[in-house]
Amino acid sequence: MGEKKPETLDFVKDFQEYLTQQTHHVNMISGSVSSDKEAETLQGGTQNHDALSANSPCLALPAAATDSDQNGLDHPSVEVSLDESAGMLVDGFERTFDGKLKCRYCNYASKGTARLIEHIRIHTGEKPHRCHLCPFASAYERHLEAHMRSHTGEKPYKCELCSFRCSDRSNLSHHRRRKHKMLPIKGTRPSLGNKKMWGVLQKKVSSLGYTRRTLINLSPPSMVVHKADYLSDFAHEIPSIQSEAYEHLAKASHSVGLSRDPQELMVDNPLNQLSTLAGQLSSLPPDTQNPASPDTGPCPDEKPFMIQQPPPPACSSAVSTSVAQSSSPASPEGRPSHNHRNCSPMAGPSSERSGRTSTPSISNSQPSTPAPALPVQDPQLLHHCQHCDMYFADNILYTIHMGCHGFENPFQCNICGCKCKNKYDFACHFARGACCQHSSRCAFRRTDDHVTK
């Protein structure tokens, strides 16, 4: 027994020293114990335990436990001390239950000390960040950095849609909302992929030069004149398209392919109202549509796409046209009768005129949506014009186009009677709008056909 007692006493003494060190650590953090008392707690022994009992009663062990209890452990008291110490002051700031640092003036809480110090300066009015060139002072370092750009002339923030530059991010956001009608996106900030998307969109718009787009023209022949299209302010409409919608449409267009049915695609097509108008051609002027080339046949997709025609010798640029899908399935059909001579020639050559006014571009009512690379459709499912060597996916468009050819001479304009040499000259005739120059004949035919604007 004489050998075991020293071991027990030594164990209790070691445990008391451990508690003393823990108490000293807690007191150093909370700042509730002065330096003199901290020196006394480092001496150990019974005096350390008494000082611990006097300063921190909640952390002290009962005297009976140190004398009679061989274990000498009072674990619940140690656990309570750790729980209570979590709510104590840390670096002069009180911590909340979720571990954040709480402001002593209000209910603001922050995980970082630097952010909390900046917040406290709002209450104290302290502005340590001062400009050496003017009386400007701020409580935030980032505000001083933005202010110094006004002296240096640096403008790191640039608008992706125009040449506007500014020194502050908030000014750029205001510019987007005011100039480009760009609504702020709720939630998180745009990711890097969205920024790259805007960069690609900017390059595409700059390459097109904001010129006229080749779109489906629903106007009668009397309205096909050399004037700016209603999309001349295309650059001001692009920013209204949100980046999320842009990516969604882009992914959808790439994932569709040829696996879907043309009728299903026509339901999802934003231009599906054109098919309704095309179905009323028996009583209304025919809508405008563009021809297609045998090299790149049309393919069902969610939006019209561009088809290039072989360039004529007299014209340097390629004729870019677009073909809209119809809700009715396409089937081969022969050349229509001559009673279509008064129909609008927009199905092919006339739309080529609008195609020549711009480079091969995207044809869609939503101009920010890119046109994916589309595979070639089987020519047997298309309507073929033997004179112009063009393919049409719509029977109505094919009928309108064939009505532009003369009955005796296929390369004679059925609108104004102008005779062309070949298919290239015939296409250039409508692309230039030459038939509109014959005002007397066009006026007579418009009156005869009861065509109204």
Swiss-Prot record:
Localization per Swiss-Prot or TrEMBL: Nucleus
SUPFAM superfamilies according to UniProt: beta-beta-alpha zinc fingers (SSF57667)
One term under GO cellular component: nucleus
Region (Disordered): 279-375
Zn-finger segments (C2H2-type): 101-123, 129-151, 157-180, 383-405, 411-438
GO biological process: regulation of transcription by RNA polymerase II
Keyword field: DNA-binding, Metal-binding, Nucleus, Repeat, Repressor, Transcription, Transcription regulation, Zinc, Zinc-finger
Extent of Low complexity compositional bias: 315-332
Main subcellular localisation: nucleus
Alphabetized InterPro entries for the sequence: Ikaros_C2H2-ZF, Znf_C2H2_sf, Znf_C2H2_type
SMART domains associated with the record: ZnF_C2H2 (SM00355)
UniProt biased composition (Polar residues): 279-293, 356-368
Family as reported in the entry's similarity comment: Belongs to the Ikaros C2H2-type zinc-finger protein family.
Known partners and oligomeric status: Probably self-associates.
PANTHER family assigned to the protein according to its UniProt record, in alphabetical order: ZINC FINGER PROTEIN (PTHR24404), ZINC FINGER PROTEIN PEGASUS (PTHR24404:SF55)
Protein name (Swiss-Prot/TrEMBL): Zinc finger protein Pegasus
